[in-house]
Amino acid sequence: MCPSIFVWVPRHRPAHRRSGLRGGEIDDVQGLTGFRRGPAKLRITRRGVTVICVIAAAAVVAVVVSIGVTSSPGANTAKPASSPAATGPGGGVSAGPTTQTTSVAAAATFAGPSGTEAPWVVAENAKPGTTAWKITGTQSPTGIMGYANRVQASDGQSVSLYVSTAAARFHVDAYRMGYYGGKGARLVWSSGQVAGSTQAACPVTPGINMVECKWTQSLSFTVNPTWVQGQYLLELVGSGGQESYVPLTVWDPSSTAAYVVMSGVLTEAVFNAFGGYDLYQGATPCAPNHYPCSTRARVVSFDRPFASGNGAGGYLSLMYPLTRLMEQHGLDVTYWTDITLAEHPNLLGKHKVLISPGHDEEWSNSMRQGAVSGANAGVNLVFFGASPILRKVRLQASPLGADREVVNYRNPVKDPLYGVDNARVSQNWWGQAPANLPASTLVGAKYVGFNNLTSFPMVVSAPSSWLYAGTGLGAGASIPGVMSSDFQAYDPARSANPPNVEVLSHSPVTVQFNPSRHYADTVFYTMASSKAGVFTSGTVNWIPSLVACAASVSNCPATMMRKLTLNVMRVFGAGPVGATYPSTANWQSFYG
């Protein structure tokens, strides 16, 4: 019998509807907070198949290539002292003079053992890292918190921060997230000391229950070439020891990197309950058997802090483990948010694969059109989370800028745009009218439910697939604890399913609030004309499963899941997958 493993549930997830994510006192990103131990241990038992209880570690060595990039601050492992910074417009703090870095487009890419690699990524992660970015203590939600006027920025753009704190003073440390010799981040910039203040309560807009803060700007800085493209955590550090994060993606519109990692900020915003409202719940409890809650918000705003993850939302569990793995292996990556795809769908054709790492339910019409157009032109699509493209939303401006409010009335008839601009009307499901486009027509599987209390093994169903290359896994072998939270499965009853869907794993799961047994599927298919490949994991827990477990957990899935993930990178980063690995329909073996 295998030893016990634990299910971890983020504190902010509503009990009726959010992701149960595994984690622990982990050695890879030790010290992350914002998780609690789930209500029950679960024991993975044998089901007439081989259960992997102890996974042999595979030693993978990243080749470091020096291209003469100058080091930046960040070698320290304690909280860095702030240095004075120049005063920007309006009394804010702006970045001072800094050393220029080599252009990330300067060196050609090459095929490596784990996928398409880029020397600049290898060199960037050879720079001194730091563990000072980790928030390890228990933080008061109101000790220090903030938000930015942008969720993404590029070179030359100004970023304003709006901070409320009980501290007399605070400063900001900007960390680029990656591998950095296992330390996980590099310090790129620090502000000077800024006077702290407690900002006003954030008003709720009647009728739509939107919480949108009207705070005074605390400081600003300008992104310059020292801010290498990537995912950043801006750590707010109060003089009294208060700490929290503000996430920021720095993106490069000129990038032609093989891999686009797209942060699902729309879904993070939709589940952000700061101020008492999100698109799933309101300040008062749901009425019995009434879902979604009638008191929920109809519009949510980025003009407010994230209530969970010490201000980082779900980033550290649902996205960061993939960033860390890809940069450890020097993969040729660039970073977007889903707002990038919504605003610049035409740029997707410059890349080989679009990767949606975590929970990615909320998609706008322009996002979906961009992904479909890209796939029709040969761009591969990877959905590492479950329930992607589940709900149809639209973006609109807030007082701080364009595309900072996310709209979903859930009932399209209640949307003011219904009958006026049906292409932009919000919907509970993409498959309902007026869109009539189920997510499964693109991702190859449908959302079938969730389980936030228990995880289940991922069961191999196509052992000869490229996904399992080099693993030694045979048919019926299982990887413990991978299938959890939201689930996807192939549905043969849907007439518009893509052809040639290949079920790579077919895993028995139990859905909460439904006692019957279901399955969760990892699926893959290729398009006949463009040869693009589409991969869907079938679980929200794929990316969290990349994180090493506590030493006491002997049946940790991390090593095997990293191998599978790198197999996806190797195959999908080489160009249209159908040219080398065309899918072979096998769904009839499971749903015939």
Regions found by a protein language model. Give the residues of each.
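Proline/serine/threonine-rich low-complexity linkers at boundaries of modular beta-sandwich domains
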Residues: 115-143
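C-terminal region of N-terminal signal peptides and the immediate post-cleavage residues
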Residues: 62-99
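Ligand-binding face of N-terminal immunoglobulin V-set domains in extracellular IgSF glycoproteins
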Residues: 145-168, 174-180, 185-247
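Terminal targeting segments of Actinobacterial cell-envelope proteins
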Residues: 1-46
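Glycine-rich, aromatic-lined ligand/substrate-binding cores of catalytic
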Residues: 401-548, 557-566, 571-572, 576
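Helical hinge/lid and interdomain linker segments adjacent to catalytic or ligand-binding clefts
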Residues: 199-213, 219-222, 226-228, 311-397, ...
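Secretory targeting and sorting signals
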Residues: 46-69
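Aromatic-Pro/Gly-enriched surface loop or interdomain linker
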Residues: 165-170, 174-178, 185-193, 240-347, ...
